[in-house]
Every structure is written in structure tokens, then in C-alpha cells.
Swiss-Prot record:
It comes from Roseiflexus sp. (strain RS-1). The gene is rimO. HAMAP family: MTTase_RimO (MF_01865). This is Ribosomal protein uS12 methylthiotransferase RimO. Keywords: 4Fe-4S, Cytoplasm, Iron, Iron-sulfur, Metal-binding, S-adenosyl-L-methionine, Transferase. One of its GO terms (cellular component) is cytosol.
């Protein structure tokens, strides 16, 4: 059968979609570029916040409206787990596949191929036709025992010079605003050997940047009995990867960042001097209500240690604006913290009241108009900070991973890429005149700094390893 996968949400979902694609391809099914050409359309759903769930339902409705006779629609992933009844009730959905069961996509497709208009049951019942039973969420689930994602054979489909590598799934934290543990469960780490094998396969396929992702990256290996598991993994990873590769760390919660991890990042040439460190707020009372570590002074010391070990490090963080009870004083403390710390990159989320979370039941919910005003204040503040941080690079040479080419309206050719300071999809770009092959590293002298991007010109002197990517 021909299949097409639509991925919504975060990079972890992208990894799961690649896993489903590789499983289906290994079973003889054929990927196609457009949903209209597929016999089976898989939508890997997102349930992060209300807006993500609405987008998921919109996509399911859109695909269902275009379904042709004999075409099937499978809803997979987080929302299929967290809101299974709602997803099952969406018109045209033929099967559900939860976020913990994506590696059983082959069973689902084989079932649909073998018995038209059927879906699966989650309990001990046999496969049953939808036409003869209620279309409840249970009736749509895939049967059988849970298959562990950590050992599922995956052959990644390489589509560019960068790839995400998920090292764990689930989270042991219970932040007051977050629903993820309710459908992902506690953290489960992938074995070091399995990660090394996947990384080696990616490198052999030509991937130049491996981005490590997880719900809680710095907690990696705790369930395996490892101390400083992420640092240990990075040592092993850099031992097998060529020197001209990048390794990037995303979703690194600060209370898991140890002295050993900082030293490991500084020591290995492959590791980008970049850290995505979600903090969510800076005022201790707000953090307590969030069920987050409230020690902002420790965070300041940690940032100082990171910059002492890697003076060129680019730091990114994310914050939630309008959390219940956030007073004007607490908000001012956050803006003061941003001015003091000077992050290179910041993502800002408007608080979303998620049913079933402790935060949803808190008093003093902030009016939306106040959240919006504070969000714009933070964004304007950080825009200026990011511009100033970018200006430090004017006149300097920085290594760039080329991601594509283009041209201006007047026909001038240019290339687009990212430096070590820029994670895929969420950060800025480096643009420079001329053309360079996609997937190659080039050195660029920065000539202009914008709010989030850099402009420059390619220089001839190549760097001989990945170390210069962290700045010369």
C-alpha cells in the first residue's frame, strides 16, 4: 500500500514519524509525497496545548474530507492517547495508534489492508468491523501487547543535513501546567548502544548535525541506573562520530546540568556550544506555583559556569507568560532577569489553561488581554537583546552548515544555513552571497546583524574540523 505521514507538533513527533515510515517501508509499503495519492494517511497528532489539539482536529477533518473509497485515515501520537474519544469521534478516522504504540503501525496497516473498513480493539477482543460496533475509542485501538519503542528497528529517512535523535521519552517531572506525563508517562531512556548505532547510521548517511531531543534531556539514563548519563552518552557519541559533525542539545532542564556535563560539552569538538535550557520563569513564587525549582540564583550561577567554560556559548530558553497568580511584580522580575542574563534566543509561550492540570485549578487566572500585553512586552525586550547578541559577530568568521540556496528579486544568488548558535526550525539563519552545496560546512565572515539572522560573505580558508563552528 502507498502511505503518507503528516507530522504535527515537536521534533520528538518527527522522530516517531520517521520510525513509522521506516517500519512501513520495511514491510513493503511505499511512501508518497501527497496525501491524495496514498492508500493510508497517518496523522501523527499533537496534544501539547489547546491550540495544538485544535490544529490536529482541523487536519483530521481536512484529510477526511478528501478521502476516497478504499483510502484509510490513522490518527497516531499524543492526542490519540490523551483525547482518544475525541479523536475517534472525528469523521473518517479508521484507527487510533497511541504515542506509546507507534511502532505497531505495520499491524494497523496490515489489518486495514486485509479487512476493509475495520479497526482494532485495545483489549483482548479480536479485530472488529466498524460497521458492526460502536466507534468508541477502544474499538479503534490496535490490539496486542505494547512494543517498546526503545528496541524498535528504525531506518531513518534522511531529508536534509540535520536529523533529530530521541534519546528518551516521557518525563518524571510533574510541572503544574504540563499534560505530557499524563499521556507519555515516566521517562524511559534508550540504551546507549542503541543510540550510538542510530547516530552512526545517520552519520554514514551523510547527516552533518545530530540534534538530541527528549522531554527532559538532562535526566537521561536515570532509569538505567546511570549517574551523569547525558555526559556519559556524549563521551561515547563523540568517540564514534567523525570530527566534522555537530551534536546539539535541546530541552536540557537546568537542574540536570552538572559540572561533568559542562566539561564534556567544552571538551568535545563535535558538541555545539549551544544549550536550550527551558526555565519557564524567573520569580521564585511563580516557579513554586509551577512546581519548578525556585532557585533563580542557582540558575544565574549555572549560566555563569556555562559561559566561563564556553565563552562563545549560545543560550536559549523558554518562558511562560501569564501563569496563574503572576503579579506585575513577578512579571517585572522576569523582564529584569532577561535584561541581566542576556539570552541569545528566547521562546515565549502564552499560558494555556489545560484541563486536568494543577494549574487549571489555581485561583487568580490572568485575563487574556493581560497575557497578550505581557507577551508583546517580553518579545520586544528580547528582540533588542537578540539583536545586540548578534552584533557581537559582525566582522568575525563563523562556521555555517548550508541548508539551501535561493535568489533575490533582482536575481542575485545566495545561500542559507545555520551556525552553531542556531537550532533547526526555532532559531535564526545565516545568509550569504553566492552558492555552496547543501550539507557542506563553509566559513562565513559576518557583515550584518539583524534581530535574529546574520548576513555575511563566504571566505576561502576552510576550518579543518568542527571546532571553528563554535566561533573563531
Amino acid at each position: 500500500m502507498k502511505f503518507h505521514i503528516i507530522t504535527l507538533g515537536c521534533p520528538k513527533n518527527q522522530v516517531d514519524s520517521e520510525g513509522m515510515s521506516s517500519i512501513l517501508a520495511a514491510q513493503g509499503h511505499t511512501p508518497v509525497a501527497h496525501a491524495d495519492d496514498a492508500d493510508v494517511v497517518v496523522v501523527n497528532t499533537c496534544s501539547f496545548i489547546a491550540a495544538a489539539r485544535e490544529e490536529t482536529l482541523d487536519v483530521l477533518r481536512e484529510v477526511a474530507a478528501r478521502k476516497t473509497p478504499g483510502q484509510y485515515l490513522v490518527a497516531a501520537g499524543c492526542m490519540a492517547e490523551s483525547h482518544s474519544a475525541l479523536v475517534a469521534a472525528a469523521p473518517g478516522v479508521d484507527a487510533l495508534l497511541s504515542t506509546r504504540e507507534w511502532m505497531r503501525i505495520g499491524d494497523v496497516v496490515d489489518t486495514l489492508q486485509r479487512e476493509p473498513a475495520v479497526a482494532a480493539s485495545s483489549a483482548a477482543r479480536e479485530i472488529i468491523p466498524l460497521s458492526s460496533a460502536p466507534a468508541s475509542s477502544d474499538d479503534l485501538r490496535v490490539p496486542g501487547a505494547y512494543a517498546d519503542w526503545r528496541t524498535a528497528p528504525i531506518r531513518r529517512r534522511i531529508t536534509g543535513p540535520s536529523a533529530y535523535l530521541k534519546i528518551s521519552d516521557g518525563c518524571n517531572l510533574r510541572c503544574a501546567f504540563c499534560t505530557i506525563p499524563s499521556f507519555k508517562g515516566d521517562m524511559r531512556s534508550k540504551a546507549v548502544g542503541a543510540i550510538l548505532g542510530e547516530a552512526q547510521e545517520l552519520a554514514d548517511a551523510g547527516v552533518k548535525e545530530i540534534v538530541l531531543v527528549a522531554q527532559h534531556l538532562t535526566d537521561y539514563g536515570r532509569d538505567l541506573g546511570l549517574k551523569d548519563g547525558l555526559a556519559l552518552l556524549l563521551d561515547e557519541l563523540c568517540a564514534v562520530l567523525p570530527k566534522d559533525r555537530w551534536v546539539r542539545l535541546m530541552y536540557a532542564y537546568p537542574h540536570g546540568i552538572s559540572e561533568r556535563l559542562i566539561a564534556t560539552m567544552a571538551r568535545h569538538p563535535q558538541i555545539c556550544h549551544y544549550l536550550d535550557m527551558p526555565l519557564q520563569h524567573a520569580h521564585p513564587e511563580t516557579l513554586r506555583r509551577m512546581h519548578r525549582p525556585p532557585d533563580s540564583d542557582r540558575t544565574r550561577r549555572l549560566i555563569a559556569d556555562l559561559r566561563a567554560a564556553m565563552p562563545d556559548i549560545a543560550l536559549r530558553s523558554t518562558f511562560i507568560i501569564g501563569f496563574p497568580g503572576e503579579t506585575s511584580a513577578e512579571f517585572r522580575a522576569l523582564t529584569a532577569f532577561l535584561e541581566e542574563v542576556q539570552f541569545d534566543r528566547v521562546g515565549v509561550f502564552r499560558y494555556s489553561r489545560e484541563p486536568g492540570t494543577p494549574a487549571a485549578a489555581l485561583p487568580d487566572q490572568i485575563p487574556q488581554r493581560v497575557i497578550e500585553r505581557r507577551w508583546h512586552t517580553i518579545m520586544r525586550l528580547q528582540q533588542g537583546i537578540s539583536r545586540q547578541r548578534n552584533r557581537r559577530w559582525v566582522g568575525r568568521v563563523i562556521r555555517v552548515l548550508v541548508e539551501g540556496q535561493g535568489q533575490t528579486d533582482d536575481g542575485r544568488l545566495l545561500s542559507v544555513g545555520r551556525s552553531f548558535r542556531d537550532a533547526p526550525e526555532v532559531d535564526g539563519q545565516v545568509l550569504f552571497w553566492g552558492t555552496a552545496a547543501t550539507g557542506t560546512f563553509v566559513d562565513v565572515r559576518v557583515t550584518q546583524a539583524l534581530d535574529y539572522d546574520l548576513w555575511g560573505e563566504m571566505v576561502e580558508a576552510p576550518a579543518d574540523d568542527a571546532r571553528s563552528e563554535n566561533g573563531t
